[in-house]
C-alpha cells in the first residue's frame, strides 16, 4: 500500500534546506573584473554608552560613508541579497568618510573620537570583494552644565520662565546639536502662540560655551596659572561640559506682538482664482457677524458652520495653534477640497482714558497695535458623488463547503453639503453573495442591505458648554440601516438598526458615544438549522430572536512609542443593552440584556525597508437576563467569530472554536461557530520583494494565536466553555506567509496559513506531528448530506483587501 508520509517529509526538509541555502548567499552582478570593489561596509562603535545609543549611532553613521564606499544592495523575496554594479574600491574615500562621520559625531556631542578603518579583500573566482570596517572609539559625551535664557524683551523672558519646565535642556543631559535645534523650535512655537507672528527660527540663537569659569579668576602667579590650566584640561577630559545660553538676535521686526483682527470667508473660491482679485471683488451676498464676514455670489453655505469652526477671536493675541486648529476644522467638514489662507497686516489704534485730578485734566492716550486680518479661500468639493466598489474575498479549507468565494457590490451616494449646513450624507446599497466552489448548489449566502448616515458638524444637545472649543473636531451622527441575509437551508435574518451618537476628537484621541442604539431582528429558522438544533441544542441559545436597545462608548487613540520608528494604536469599546428597559414587564421575553466589552492594541515597528506588526485583541460579552426565551448567551449577531482573511488565517471564516469542542467539527449540518469570549494575538513581519511598474509587491511571515469560547457552561458542549485547566489545550496557533500587491489606492493580499496547533486535532494535544506530517486531518471521517466525505484541511488560503491589522 502506498504511504505518502515519507516523501512528504523529504519534500518538506528539502524545501527548508533550499530556503536556507537561498537566503545565505549574496549574489554580485555586473561587477568590475580583476579590480577590488566594495562588497560590504560595516561600522562598530565602542564606548561607555547604552545599547540603544550604540545601535542608533551605528545606524545613523551608515549615512555618512562616501558615495563610492556605499553598497548598492537589493533584497529579493525578503531573504536573498543581490549587489548590482558595485563601486570600484577607492582608498581616498576613506578619509572623506572619516571627515563626514567625525562631523556627525561632533554634532551629537562626541568630540574626543578616534576612527580607524580595516580593509579586507576576499577573492571569489574573479571577484575581489572588499569589506570596509570602520571602528569608532568614543570619548565621553559632552553634557549640559547650565542653561540660561537671556532675552532683552521682558515679555519674551516671562514667557520662557513660565514654561521652563517643558525644556529638555536639563543639567546633566547629553549635549547635541539636535537637542539644541529641537529646543529652539519649541521656543519658536511657544512665542508664536503668544502673539509673535513674524518670529522664526533664525531670530533666535543658542550660545554654547565650553570655557572653564575658574580660568577667568585673576592671578599674577605664573605657576598658579599653569596649575589652573592643567586642572581645567583634566576636568574637561574626565567630564566635558557646556553652558548653553539662548537669546534673541539683534532684530526688532520679529519681536512685535500681533492681535487678531477680522476674518473673511470666500466659500465659493475656484482653484484658479487669484486671492488678491477676490479680496477686491464685489459679491452679491455679504453677511457679517462680529469680526467674521462671509462673501458669496449665490446661496452656498450658511454662516453658522463657518462661525462654529473658527477659533480666531478679535482682540486676542495671535495664536498659531488656534490658527491651524481653524484650518483643520474647516478642512474636516468635508464640504471643501482645498483651503487657502492669506493674512494681511494692519495697524489699529487703542484709545485709553487717563483720568485727571484737580490740577491736570483727563487725557486720552492713543496707542498703535499690530493686527492680522485672515482671508479664507475655500474651494468647494463636488457636492454629489456616486461610487461603486467590488469586494472579493476567498477562504479555502472549510469543512463544510471546501472553498468559499465572497463577492459584494457597494453603491455609495454622498452629499457633502446637505441643507447648506456642511452636513455630510452617505447612502450605501450593498448586495453580496457567498459561493461554494465545491458544491452542487453554488449559492450559499445572499445579503442585501441599505444604510443611510447623516453627520452633522456640531453637538446637538439641550445644553452647550464652552469646553467644546477645546476639542479639535466634533459631530453628531445619525444612522439607519436595514438588511436581509439568507443562509441557504439554515436561516433568513431581517434587521433594522437605528442609532444616534456623538463623536469628538482631541489631539489623537477619538471618542464615540451612542446614547441610543436600537436594533430589531426577526429570524426564520430553516430545516438545516432546525436539524442542527436537534444535534447541538446549545445553538438555540444563540439563535433566539429579540430586540436590542443599547448604548455604546468607544475610545481609540494613536500614540508614538519610546522610539521614533514605533507607532501604537489602542481601541476600547463597551456596550450595554437592556439595563433599564429590561425591568419593564412588557419587554420581558423580547429584550436582550447584556454587557459586552472589547479591547485592541496594535503596534507597528518600522525599519529601513521592513516592519514588524503586533496585534492583541480581547473581548467578552455577558448575558445577564437569564431569560430562556432570549437565551443565556449573546445573540449570534453580537458574538465573536474567528477565522478568515483578518483573524486566525489558518482557519476559514467562522470555522474555529469553540474552545477544543468537536461538536461543530463532527457535525454534518451547521458549521459556523459564535462565542461570548475571544482572545487573539497576531504577529507579522512584513518585507518588500520587488516593484513592477507602479505596483509594490511585498510579503509577510505571520503567526496567529487565539480562539473563541462560551462564557457559561453548556451541558451538551462542555469543552466550549473557557476554563483555565483547558486553556493551553484550547489555544489555536497558525503560521503562514503570503503576497501583498500594493496598487497605492488599495492593496490585494493572498495569504497561506497552516495549523500548527489545532484544538480540534485529537492527537498530540493538538500539535502537528512533524514525523507524521499530513496536509489533511484524517482522524475521523465525516460524510455530508450528499454522502461524500468532507475534507478537514490543516491549511487555508485567504484572499483579502488591505492589511489584516
Kindly label every feature range from the protein language model.
Residues 393-401, 414, 512-697, 701-726, ...:
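C-terminal outer-membrane beta-barrel translocator/porin domains of Gram-negative envelope proteins
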Residues 47, 134-140, 151-153, 244-248, ...:
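Flexible glycine-/small-residue-rich
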Residues 121-128, 206-224, 324, 344-374, ...:
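Beta-rich nucleic-acid/ligand-interaction surfaces
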Residues 2-13:
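Bacterial N-terminal signal peptides that target proteins for export
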Residues 700-702, 747-753:
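Conserved active-site loop/cleft motifs that coordinate metal ions or position small ligands
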Residues 2, 26-332:
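Interaction-mediating elements
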Residues 156-160, 299-300, 316-571, 604, ...:
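Gram-negative/organellar outer-membrane beta-barrel architecture
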Residues 21-24:
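C-terminal motif of bacterial Sec signal peptides marking the signal peptidase cleavage site
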